[in-house]
Amino acid sequence: MEKTITIYTDGACSGNPGKGGWGALLMYGNTRKEISGYDPATTNNRMEMMAAIRALEALKEPCRVELYSDSAYLVNAMNQGWLKRWLKNGWKTASKKPVENIDLWQEIVKLTTLHRVTFHKVKGHSDNQYNNRCDELARLAIKEQS
């Protein structure tokens, strides 16, 4: 039977662009795993995406995933058909401009083919303890490298 994993992700940037960090929390049953990372020159959107990518890469086998993010950019691209349209249009937006962050979107395409991922939007910086923990991990990743 396919495992269902719950993942919370968040990204942060000190300046946008600037130093960035990402954090993710993976939960399965009573098991919790926290991961985080840093980039010296990035954007907030890239860190939001990187959190999701690294969390999905951490899974050891194909899983069903409930992924929670406060990034409208990430969640809307997945749930409102933006990504499908970009693929169909050769990585061009509706206004015929190149899609930003193509490298990361291509990684997300690969990972969402391997795993069955449902994306959920959560309100950032509110009372969601898991999202708040991911925000803390992302900010700590920046602080530890500064």
Swiss-Prot record:
Where does the UniProt annotation locate this protein? Cytoplasm
What InterPro entries does the record tag this protein with?
A: RNase_H (IPR050092), RNaseH-like_sf (IPR012337), RNaseH_domain (IPR002156), RNaseH_sf (IPR036397), RNaseHI (IPR022892)
Provide the cofactor note recorded for this chain's UniProt entry: Binds 1 Mg(2+) ion per subunit. May bind a second metal ion at a regulatory site, or after substrate binding.
Q: Which PROSITE patterns match?
A: RNASE_H_1 (PS50879)
Cofactor(s) recorded in Swiss-Prot or TrEMBL:
Mg(2+)
Give coiled-coil spans as residue ranges.
Answer: none
Q: Which GO terms describe its molecular function?
A: magnesium ion binding; nucleic acid binding; RNA-DNA hybrid ribonuclease activity
Q: Which residues bind Mg(2+) 2?
A: 10, 135
Q: Name one GO biological process term.
A: DNA replication, removal of RNA primer
One Pfam match: RNase_H
What are its GO cellular component terms?
cytoplasm
Q: Which UniProt keywords apply?
A: Cytoplasm, Endonuclease, Hydrolase, Magnesium, Metal-binding, Nuclease
Main EC class the enzyme belongs to: hydrolase
E.C. number(s) listed in UniProt: 3.1.26.4
Q: Does the keyword Nuclease apply?
A: yes
Catalysed reactions, as listed in the record: Endonucleolytic cleavage to 5'-phosphomonoester
Binding of Mg(2+) 1 occurs at 10, 48, 70
Every RNase H type-1 domain range? 1-143
The family line of this record is: Belongs to the RNase H family.
Quaternary structure?
A: Monomer.
- Which PANTHER family does this one have? RIBONUCLEASE H1 (PTHR10642:SF26)
Q: What does this protein do?
A: Endonuclease that specifically degrades the RNA of RNA-DNA hybrids.
Name the HAMAP family for this protein: RNase_H (MF_00042)
Q: What is this protein called?
A: Ribonuclease H
Question: Lineage of the native species?
Answer: Bacteria, Pseudomonadati, Chlorobiota, Chlorobiia, Chlorobiales
